[in-house]
Swiss-Prot record:
GO terms for biological process: regulation of DNA-templated transcription. Signal peptide: none annotated. GO terms for molecular function: DNA binding. It is found in: Cytoplasm. Keywords: Cytoplasm, DNA-binding, Transcription, Transcription regulation. GO terms for cellular component: cytoplasm. This is Probable transcriptional regulatory protein ECH_0704. Transmembrane segments: none annotated.
Length: 248
C-alpha cells in the first residue's frame, strides 16, 4: 500500500538529529541491555539484540561501549535493571500519546512525564485510557534501495503472515522506505525470517499505530505539540512516542 501515512514521520531511534550525542548513546545502551537480558547475549541468536546493535552502530556508538552494555546485562546491578513501561496520555488539541519507556524507577518516570504533559495542557492517563485508539503492531523497515523489488518483499512478508507492507516517502529525506507491518505475536519470527532473506532491516520495533489520525491545523496548537514532543524526547527514560496526530 503506497502513500502518506503516520509511518512517514516515525522516529526509529527517538530524538531529533540535533539531540545530544550522550543522550542518544544512553538510550541505545539501555535498549542493548534490555535486549541482552531478554534472550541470549549473542546477536546471532537474539534478533532484538541484533537490531539494537545495528541501531547503535548507525549512531556511531563505539564498539567497546556496545560490548560493555552486553556484558553488563549478565550482571545484576539495580541501575541496569530496566523495565519496559508504556505510559498513556493526552496532549494539546486532545491528541493521544503512547509513550514507551525503559526505566529503573516507575515513580520517577511517571512524575516527570506528568509534569511535561501538564506544562502543555495535557495529562497522564490511566492504563487503557488511550491505548484503545491504537493497534499494537510490529514494524520492520527496509530502504527501497536495499531490496530487489517491492513485490519480492511484499510476497515474502505475506507468506510470513504479515498484515501489510506500506511504501512511504520519508518527509525529511525523501527516501522511499518499505514498512512491513505484522501482529505483535509474529514480530520476532517475521523479523528473523526477513533478516535471513534480505539481511538487516533499517530498523524494527513494536509500534502503536493509530486507528484514525487527528489533523491539527491550528498553528498555536501545532507549536505546543512540537514543544511537548521535544520535552518528552529529552527525557532519558523515553524511547519512543507514538501518537494519532498529523499536521498535514
Amino acid at each position: 500500500m503506497a502513500g502518506h501515512s503516520q509511518f512517514a514521520n516515525i522516529k526509529h531511534r527517538k530524538g531529533a538529529q540535533d539531540a545530544k550525542r550522550a543522550q542518544k548513546f544512553t538510550k541505545l545502551i539501555r535498549e542493548i541491555i534490555v535486549a541482552a537480558k531478554q534472550g541470549l547475549p549473542d546477536p546471532e541468536f537474539n534478533s532484538r539484540l541484533r537490531s539494537a546493535i545495528i541501531a547503535a552502530k548507525k549512531e556511531n556508538l563505539p564498539k567497546d561501549r556496545i560490548d560493555a552494555a552486553i556484558k553488563s546485562a549478565t550482571g545484576n546491578t539495580q541501575t541496569d535493571n530496566y523495565e519496559e513501561v508504556v505510559y498513556e496520555g493526552y496532549g494539546p488539541g486532545n491528541i493521544a500519546l503512547m509513550i514507551q519507556t525503559l526505566t529503573n524507577n516507575r515513580n520517577r518516570t511517571a512524575a516527570e512525564l506528568r509534569h511535561a504533559l501538564s506544562k502543555y495542557n495535557g495529562k497522564l492517563g490511566e492504563s487503557g485510557s488511550v491505548s484503545f485508539l491504537f493497534n499494537h503492531v510490529g514494524v520492520i523497515a527496509y530502504k527501497a534501495s536495499s531490496i530487489d523489488s517491492f513485490d519480492s518483499l511484499f510476497n515474502t512478508a505475506i507468506e510470513l503472515h504479515a498484515l501489510d507492507v506500506e511504501e512511504i516517502i520519508q518527509d525529511d529525506t525523501q527516501e522511499k522506505i518499505y514498512y512491513v507491518i505484522c501482529n505483535v505475536q509474529d514480530f520476532g519470527n517475521v523479523r528473523d525470517q526477513l533478516f535471513h532473506k534480505f539481511s538487516d532491516a533499517e530498523f524494527s520495533r513494536l509500534f502503536w499505530k493509530a486507528s484514525d489520525t487527528v489533523k491539527i491545523e491550528d498553528e498555536e496548537i501545532q507549536k505546543k505539540i512540537s514543544n511537548l514532543m521535544d520535552l518528552l524526547e529529552n527525557n532519558d527514560d523515553v524511547q519512543y512516542i507514538d501518537s494519532n496526530f498529523t499536521f498535514y
